[in-house]
Amino acid sequence: MQSTCLRALPWLMLLLLTACAGQPPLTDTTQDWDSQRAALAAMDAWTLRGKLALRTTDRSESASVIWQQSGSNADLRLSGPLGAGATRVSSNGRQLVVSQNGKADTFDISTPDAVAASTGWNLPVKALPYWVRGLPAPEPAPSMTTIDAGLMQRFEQAGWQVHYERYQTV
């Protein structure tokens, strides 16, 4: 049971990036959505540093996160207090490799059912890099979008609700 929980933890943390991650640099929050979307979509290299939290009815977890993205290559490092539970997630756009405790598991991103079968979590792996930047993924089309002052506030996509509480200029 503990091994299953440990394997699911990185996936849960990835999911929470959409709600807890700092947003990309913004210079003018009054930009209209079309120009904002174009600017965010053009970003193909970025680094995210922050903290995230997971709360369920029976437990809570927190982690520090560093996510480096360059084109389709991603490197995500998660760690708990004092570096405990260090996990590395890397991807080349086709495969996702999750390394923890000296063991690595590889998944084909194009078959999310394989990730779900292995981890128990049906995560939108391909959508996360878009969501972290404040964008809906290209497919499927989002529903129920809310845009305010040229910035995405919330949307629903592929059964997930994505909500941005605030943006930060850096």
Q: Where are the predicted features?
A:
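C-terminal motif of bacterial Sec signal peptides marking the signal peptidase cleavage site
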Residues: 16-19
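Gly/Pro-enriched, hydrophobic low-complexity segments
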Residues: 135-170
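Long, charged/polar, surface-exposed segments that mediate recognition or autoinhibition
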Residues: 115-117, 121-134, 141
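Bacterial N-terminal signal peptides that target proteins for export
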Residues: 1-11
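Bacterial signal peptide processing site
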Residues: 21-24
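An acidic-aromatic
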Residues: 73-124
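Post-signal peptide N-terminal segment of mature Sec-exported envelope proteins
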Residues: 27-55
